[in-house]
């Protein structure tokens, strides 16, 4: 494995350095070839590195940043006033070639705008999309996009997302001739917004896309499609609803029957069932797949959940490592060139 360097916006997210710095140390423990540039306030970061050993410190560098973009800041205002912020500096490190990817749990709109401004979209792509790969009940994976980068999407953008998602599924996930579906309120062709119906027509006529039609939200984890496409508003709401239900389910499995007087053998049986079911469904835990790639850029940018805990942010760092190792932007660009040529 070759050495690689990532830039972390350690000030972003709901918990900032208290989560991101320990996560960085955890990532270093897991990958001996990893070097991390911690972008943020040195006075805040340095005390959190007290437990880092010499070997870890040799693969860490603090890059000072004057300020942080607030999570509730309007993207347009944040971008105009972004100079000196941890998010912008982390992206600049990627642009300058000092880092191979950026990871941030900060303001999604600002990250999208700054990344597009500084790293530029791949030729043929109008706007990048946030994408993640979710596990489904058939023990396979489904590529889902957009998850919040673009609240409003026209039919052309949805079709471009479908192409990018299809290429990602084939080139990175390893799915041959991936099935592509549009998220909609019904499977009938007359259902949904104009943009969705128009995107469906575009995808039907695209020879390189294996378009299978509409899919409803309750079938997200069924494995009926390999790529699911939607606008950022719908995708974000769908993903967070699913995550909330999964967290509640896993929590109920662990707490079921607590505090009640029950025969000893029933207690043992319940504990066995709880452990068994928790193991069976643990792959659905949102912490296991935190980190959405901002797909369609000339560089690698990973967006972590703002509310990510230490384990979840570590997973986001691991996602960045995998994206760099698999050369996602380069492979997407190469495939898009041929795909878009065939679609013309």
Curated annotation (Swiss-Prot):
Location in the cell reads:
Cytoplasm
Copy the pathway line from the protein's UniProt record: Lipid metabolism; phospholipid metabolism
Is Glycosyltransferase one of the keywords UniProt gives this record?
no
Q: What class of enzyme is it?
A: transferase
GO biological process: what's one of them?
phospholipid biosynthetic process
Q: What Gene Ontology cellular component terms go with this record?
A: cytoplasm
Recorded catalytic activity of this chain's protein: a fatty acyl-[ACP] + phosphate = an acyl phosphate + holo-[ACP]
**GO MF terms on file?**
phosphate:acyl-[acyl carrier protein] acyltransferase activity
The EC number(s) given in the record are 2.3.1.274
DNA repair is among the record's keywords: no
Identify one Pfam family in the record: FA_synthesis
Q: Which InterPro entries match?
A: FA_synthesis, Phospholipid_synth_PlsX-like
Write the record's keywords in alphabetical order, separated by commas: Cytoplasm, Lipid biosynthesis, Lipid metabolism, Phospholipid biosynthesis, Phospholipid metabolism, Transferase
The UniProt entry's sequence similarity note says: Belongs to the PlsX family.
Subunit structure and binding partners: Homodimer. Probably interacts with PlsY.
Its job: Catalyzes the reversible formation of acyl-phosphate (acyl-PO(4)) from acyl-[acyl-carrier-protein] (acyl-ACP). This enzyme utilizes acyl-ACP as fatty acyl donor, but not acyl-CoA.
Q: What is this protein called?
A: Phosphate acyltransferase
Where does this protein come from, organism-wise?
Answer: Enterobacter sp. (strain 638)
Lineage of this protein's species?
Bacteria, Pseudomonadati, Pseudomonadota, Gammaproteobacteria, Enterobacterales
Name of the gene encoding the protein in the UniProt record: plsX
């Amino acid at each position: 494995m070759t050495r690689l360097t990532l830039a972390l916006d350690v000030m972003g997210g709901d918990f900032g350095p208290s989560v991101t710095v320990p996560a960085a140390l955890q990532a270093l423990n897991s990958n001996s070839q990893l070097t991390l540039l911690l972008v943020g306030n040195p006075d805040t970061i340095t005390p959190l590195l007290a437990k880092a050993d010499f070997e870890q410190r040799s693969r860490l560098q603090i890059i000072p940043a004057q300020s942080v973009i607030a999570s509730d800041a309007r993207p347009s205002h944040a971008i105009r006033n972004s100079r000196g912020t941890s998010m912008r500096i982390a992206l600049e490190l990627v642009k300058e070639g000092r880092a191979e990817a950026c990871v941030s749990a900060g303001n999604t709109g600002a990250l999208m705008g700054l990344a597009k401004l500084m790293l530029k979209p791949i030729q043929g792509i109008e706007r990048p999309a946030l994408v993640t790969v979710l596990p489904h009940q058939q023990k396979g994976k489904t590529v889902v996009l957009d998850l919040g980068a673009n609240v409003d999407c026209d039919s052309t953008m949805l079709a471009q997302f479908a192409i990018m998602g299809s290429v990602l599924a084939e080139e990175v996930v390893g799915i041959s001739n991936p099935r592509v579906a549009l998220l909609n309120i019904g499977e009938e062709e007359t259902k949904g917004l104009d943009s969705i119906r128009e995107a469906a027509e575009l995808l039907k006529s695209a020879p390189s896309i294996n378009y299978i039609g509409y899919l409803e939200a309750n079938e997200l984890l069924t494995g009926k499609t390999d790529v699911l496409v939607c606008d950022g508003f719908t995708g974000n709401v769908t993903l967070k609803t699913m995550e909330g239900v999964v967290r509640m389910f896993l929590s109920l499995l662990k707490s079921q029957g607590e505090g009640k007087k029950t025969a000893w053998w029933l207690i043992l049986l319940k504990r066995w069932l709880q452990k068994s079911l928790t193991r069976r469904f643990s792959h659905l835990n949102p912490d296991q797949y935190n980190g959405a790639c901002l797909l369609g850029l000339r560089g690698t940018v990973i967006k972590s959940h703002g509310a990510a805990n230490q384990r979840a942010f570590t997973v986001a760092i691991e996602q960045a490592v995998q994206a760099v190792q698999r050369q996602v932007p380069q492979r997407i660009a190469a495939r898009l060139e041929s795909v878009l040529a065939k679609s013309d």
